[in-house]
């Protein structure tokens, strides 16, 4: 699970957080996590309280993607990541999630991450409003996934 806000102990060293994940999660690959952290230039001797929101997000993404989970829940995975780093983060997610797993992403930044989507679930007031293949939605409304969703919402509002 990748929350949209940090749940990490602020004063704990990154190296200790990695060790904690190694203890708690049998599917956690500490070496892989250290490699992912290195791609973001996150030192093991840092603490979350010394990091920006974007760096904490990258730390949490590294921790989550170093697992071989069957289900990944990502809540706004690039919400705090600067624009320049977003493509790198998305590539990292695509390259490192368990191919036998399922990824559920909650986001408002559809344009930035639509290449990750196979299917789209639209919730309205806590209920599933739409559940369809991304390609089907694009074909029905044309354009990008974001444009298709906007067209769908306009159509529903006109009813």
Where are these regions (language model features)?
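A short, surface-exposed alpha-helical micro-motif characterized by mixed small hydrophobic
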Residues: 113-115
């Amino acid at each position: 699970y990748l929350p949209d806000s940090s749940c990490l102990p602020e004063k704990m060293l990154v190296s200790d957080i990695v060790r904690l994940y190694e203890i708690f999660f049998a599917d956690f690959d500490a070496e892989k996590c250290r490699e992912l952290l290195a791609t973001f230039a996150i030192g093991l001797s840092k603490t979350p309280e010394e990091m920006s929101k974007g760096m904490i997000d990258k730390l949490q993404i590294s921790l989550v993607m170093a697992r071989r989970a069957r289900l990944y829940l990502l809540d706004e995975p690039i919400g705090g990541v600067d624009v320049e780093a977003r493509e790198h983060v998305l590539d990292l997610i695509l390259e490192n999630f368990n191919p036998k797993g399922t990824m559920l992403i909650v986001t408002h930044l559809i344009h930035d991450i639509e290449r990750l989507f196979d299917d789209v679930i639209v919730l309205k007031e806590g209920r599933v409003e739409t559940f369809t293949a991304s390609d089907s939605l694009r074909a029905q409304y044309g354009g990008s996934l974001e444009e298709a969703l906007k067209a769908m919402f306009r159509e529903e509002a006109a009813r």
